[in-house]
Structure formats: structure tokens, C-alpha cells
Amino acid sequence: PGLIVDRYGDTLSAQFLSAGTERWKATIADLLLQATGLARLYERSDSGVRKLEGLEPVAGWLRGSGPTEVTITEHDWRLTVDVAEGHKTGFYLDQRDNRRLFADTVRHFGYQRVLNCFCYTGGFSVAALAGGAAHVTSVDSSAPALVRANSHVGLNGFDVARHEALNADVN
């Protein structure tokens, strides 16, 4: 796709990945803000795929300004997303339904211990704890992602002793 847009609370995060969307970026940005009623759009056009289109990487506020960390609510869980950092637009929103399904699965089968490999910022770890897991081990090669995963556990009121974060390469 040439355009990816995610909404995190009061902030849009967008990737303009093709020459066509780049050409119309200002118009697209204005229309997105008009359609959503928001005032902030952070551009995360820093993907290597832009080079295939002859475009340089770009990241920063396209419209508005302010802190890049946003707190969102997914199901009953609170999560923080930094639209300036991390993968893609900042978080894997497309996994929202899977995180809910995973919490329900943990609850249904009574899983007590969960290993979350490639955990990124711990969305599935929070889901496992919300589903009733007694302990979750989260593994990722990114230390900053694990810091955020730990903060998500505490942000949702879970005992941090029920969560272990391991900085390691699962491969």
C-alpha cells in the first residue's frame, strides 16, 4: 500500500510510502484531519520501501506538535505508544482482535504460564495477564521495547512480579 494511517487517541500516525501519496501528502493530511476532527498528524515515512520510489525517509510532525507518546485504550487495557519510535506507525493495531482472542483463550483453557516470544511492547503479555495467567515471560531483542512492556504490565494494575522481561534474540 502507498498509505498507512493509524489513530492513537488524539494523534494520527501516517506512512506515505509511494511517489503518488508523497505528491498528494499535504492534501491527504488536511483531509485526514478534517475527517477525524483531530489536529495532530505524525509522519513515519521512514521505511526503506520509499527508496524504491526514489524518496528519502521522512519522520516528524506533519501537522500539529506535542509529545509523541500517546496513551491508548484497547479493550479494557491501557497502553502507551510512541509514534516517533518503534515499528511501523508505533504499534500493531491490526493485532487488536487477536490480543482479545488470546486473553479469552488463556481464560478458557486456564493457562497459568505464558511465553511471549518477539513480544515487542507486550500487548499479548498484557492480554495473557488479563486472561488470568499467573506468570508471563516476555522475550524481545529490543531493550526499549521491553521497558515499555514492563510499564504496560504496571499500567494495567498487574503485579509486576507476575511478569519477566528477557532481552534476548529468540532466533
Question: Locations of the language-model features?
Answer:
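Non-catalytic substrate-recognition/targeting regions of SAM-dependent transferases
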Residues: 1-6, 23-92
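Non-transmembrane, interaction-prone segments in cytosolic or luminal domains
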Residues: 10, 48-50, 62-63, 155, ...
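Rossmann-like S-adenosyl-L-methionine
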Residues: 66-171
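Carbohydrate-binding surface patches
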Residues: 11-16
